[in-house]
């Protein structure tokens, strides 16, 4: 492997996965070598969004059209994504981070250990405060859970205290953060977490 850390980013449609990648690329690229793989079923919309935002040079972003279930493309048959990651690692070695964004999926989404070293799962407050207690691999087993769009809590009647309590119960000590990626809340904490996971940076 010619990248130090492959990071999977998953979560339901509209939760903020692409916004997370945009934010992380902009905050990390001055100090680290980064590349990104995005997944969409029939288009390369997320890749084009990141390219148009100029978060990285165009060659460092690859869009994968999965043509089917987002979960299958990151778990059962991850060959398309694996090939895209290897392509980027061969083109831009050595890389510090390769981010792999799954297409929008449900709470059962999880990455193959052959594809990524760790996973981030993103949910958002607008789906309701019951989401953390519904469980699923994304909630309970991801290496980092993000509860995004906390600014919408009052508008959708979501109780952040309930979400906090349920998340702490479901996560059993695993890290998680409240975030508002549009204003930068939580970005520093996410960045520190990722930096701590780089093999050479671990104590």
Swiss-Prot record:
<keyword id="KW-0143">Chaperone</keyword>
<protein>
    <recommendedName>
        <fullName>Urease accessory protein UreG</fullName>
    </recommendedName>
</protein>
<dbReference type="InterPro" id="IPR004400">
    <property type="entry name" value="UreG"/>
</dbReference>
<dbReference type="InterPro" id="IPR027417">
    <property type="entry name" value="P-loop_NTPase"/>
</dbReference>
<dbReference type="GO" id="GO:0043419">
    <property type="term" value="P:urea catabolic process"/>
</dbReference>
<comment type="function">
    <text>Facilitates the functional incorporation of the urease nickel metallocenter. This process requires GTP hydrolysis, probably effectuated by UreG.</text>
</comment>
<comment type="similarity">
    <text>Belongs to the SIMIBI class G3E GTPase family. UreG subfamily.</text>
</comment>
<comment type="subunit">
    <text>Homodimer. UreD, UreF and UreG form a complex that acts as a GTP-hydrolysis-dependent molecular chaperone, activating the urease apoprotein by helping to assemble the nickel containing metallocenter of UreC. The UreE protein probably delivers the nickel.</text>
</comment>
<dbReference type="GO" id="GO:0003924">
    <property type="term" value="F:GTPase activity"/>
</dbReference>
<keyword id="KW-0963">Cytoplasm</keyword>
<keyword id="KW-0996">Nickel insertion</keyword>
<keyword id="KW-0342">GTP-binding</keyword>
<feature type="binding site">
    <location>
        <begin position="11"/>
        <end position="18"/>
    </location>
    <ligand>
        <name>GTP</name>
    </ligand>
</feature>
<dbReference type="GO" id="GO:0005525">
    <property type="term" value="F:GTP binding"/>
</dbReference>
<dbReference type="GO" id="GO:0016151">
    <property type="term" value="F:nickel cation binding"/>
</dbReference>
<dbReference type="GO" id="GO:0005737">
    <property type="term" value="C:cytoplasm"/>
</dbReference>
<dbReference type="InterPro" id="IPR003495">
    <property type="entry name" value="CobW/HypB/UreG_nucleotide-bd"/>
</dbReference>
<dbReference type="Pfam" id="PF02492">
    <property type="entry name" value="cobW"/>
</dbReference>
<keyword id="KW-0547">Nucleotide-binding</keyword>
């Amino acid at each position: 492997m010619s990248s130090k850390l492959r990071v999977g980013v998953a979560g339901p449609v509209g939760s903020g996965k692409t916004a997370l990648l945009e934010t992380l690329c902009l905050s990390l690229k001055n100090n680290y070598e980064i590349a990104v793989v995005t997944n969409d079923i029939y288009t390369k919309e997320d890749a084009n969004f990141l390219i148009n935002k100029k978060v990285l040079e165009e060659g460092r972003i690859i869009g994968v059209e999965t043509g089917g279930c987002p979960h299958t493309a990151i778990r059962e048959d991850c060959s398309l994504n694996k090939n895209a990651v290897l392509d980027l690692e061969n083109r831009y070695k050595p890389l510090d981070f390769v981010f792999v964004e799954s297409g929008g999926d449900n709470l059962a989404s999880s990455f193959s250990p052959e594809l990524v070293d760790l996973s981030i799962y993103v949910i958002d407050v607008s789906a309701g405060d019951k989401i953390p207690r519904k469980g699923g691999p994304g909630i309970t087993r991801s290496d980092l859970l993000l509860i995004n769009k906390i600014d919408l809590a009052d508008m959708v009647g979501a109780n952040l205290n309930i979400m906090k309590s349920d998340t702490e119960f479901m996560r059993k000590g695993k890290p998680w953060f409240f975030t508002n990626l549009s204003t930068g809340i939580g970005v520093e904490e996410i960045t520190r977490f990722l930096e701590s996971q780089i093999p050479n940076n671990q104590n």
